[in-house]
Amino acid sequence: MIDLTGRTVMITGASRGIGAEAARIFAKAGANVALVARSADSIANLAGEIGTSAVAIPCDISRYWEVAQAVENCVTAFGGLDILINNAGVIEPIARMDEADPEGWGQVIDINLKGVFHGMRAALPVMENAGGGTILTVSSGAAHGPVEAWSHYCASKAGAAMLTMCLHKEMGDKGIRAMGLSPGTVATQMQREIKASGINPVSQLEWSDHIPADWPAKALLWMCGTEADAFLGEEISLRDEGIRKKVGLV
């Protein structure tokens, strides 16, 4: 396991699923963990589970000032910020474009796309001053192709993937390591919401078809090591058996 003793990671969407598993795994690797999510009770409970190396920071990532404050709180708690994991994301309301609620559609963009930018923008000055850092964004296969009734999700994930590429282009030579992770379908609450919609082929998958949340969490940890430097500015797919072997999943 990669040793992150003395390093600090901030994880958005840390209240459940991939984010919560990443928090546990990064803490086991020795990192200080800043848990960011709207669900204050959930992240407080998780921080209590992890112990003194974790701090809960309630935050709505769709609001930049809250994200900036979260970064400030993280730095106050642990003295810096070495790794940012943009994990928070939503998929509801699932609807075809001719029936989609414009406000709900826009809220997905606010969280999945603007939230990623907000995290990057708030973290970068801290990382630049420290001489570098790592920014990882949880992506999706939906970033690369259309899925029925997911126009909001596909558009937001495509935009977030482009942010990773732009960040690498602008800051890669300044010590900022930027990468995306496309985990495939993961056994989380989001898949329950997709299943309930019954609209597209993804909703027809069985629970056993999805990978456990600790797989992408372990991949995110691996991406913090030098072995992943070959993928800087790119998106890594956990559907790739070669990547699964590198991460130690198979």
Regions found by a protein language model. Name each.
Residues 15-16:
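Conserved glycine-rich cofactor-binding loop
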Residues 58-69, 102:
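The beta1-alpha1 cofactor-binding region of Rossmann-like NAD(H)/NADP(H)-dependent oxidoreductases
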Residues 95-97, 104-106:
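Substrate-binding pocket helix/loop in short-chain dehydrogenase/reductase
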Residues 120, 156:
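Active-site helix of classical SDR
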Residues 140:
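Residue(s) in the substrate-gating loop at a strand-loop-helix junction
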Residues 145, 166-176:
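Active-site-adjacent segment of SDR/Rossmann-fold oxidoreductases
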Residues 180-183, 188, 197-246:
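C-terminal helical subdomain
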